Amino acid sequence: MLNPSIDSLLTKIDSKYTLVTVAAKRAREMQIADNCVIEKPVSYKCVGKALEEIDLEVLKYVPSDDTIID
């Protein structure tokens, strides 16, 4: 995938793992409900649309304050 670039996406979400998780969850929502927020997305696949939403800051990730304490 060339657009949006990974560098651009990592300025929005700090971790590649988190980026993939957020995009996958949003893509699953779009498959079920078909509710893309972007009017004319470049990508036709749900994962690409989710990454575009993250890049345009329509979709944001807010980290939770839950921590694991041993």
From Swiss-Prot:
Catalytic activity as recorded in UniProt: RNA(n) + a ribonucleoside 5'-triphosphate = RNA(n+1) + diphosphate
EC id: 2.7.7.6
Statement: the UniProt record of this protein carries the keyword Iron: no
Gene Ontology MF, one: DNA binding
Record carries keyword Nucleotidyltransferase: yes
Any single GO BP term: DNA-templated transcription
Keywords: DNA-directed RNA polymerase, Nucleotidyltransferase, Transcription, Transferase
GO CC list: DNA-directed RNA polymerase complex
Quaternary state and interactors: The RNAP catalytic core consists of 2 alpha, 1 beta, 1 beta' and 1 omega subunit. When a sigma factor is associated with the core the holoenzyme is formed, which can initiate transcription.
Cross-referenced PANTHER family: DNA-DIRECTED RNA POLYMERASE SUBUNIT OMEGA (PTHR34476:SF1)
Protein family (similarity comment): Belongs to the RNA polymerase subunit omega family.
HAMAP family for the chain: RNApol_bact_RpoZ
Function: Promotes RNA polymerase assembly. Latches the N- and C-terminal regions of the beta' subunit thereby facilitating its interaction with the beta and alpha subunits.
Name the record gives this protein: DNA-directed RNA polymerase subunit omega
Record lineage: Bacteria, Bacillati, Bacillota, Bacilli, Bacillales
Encoding gene per record: rpoZ
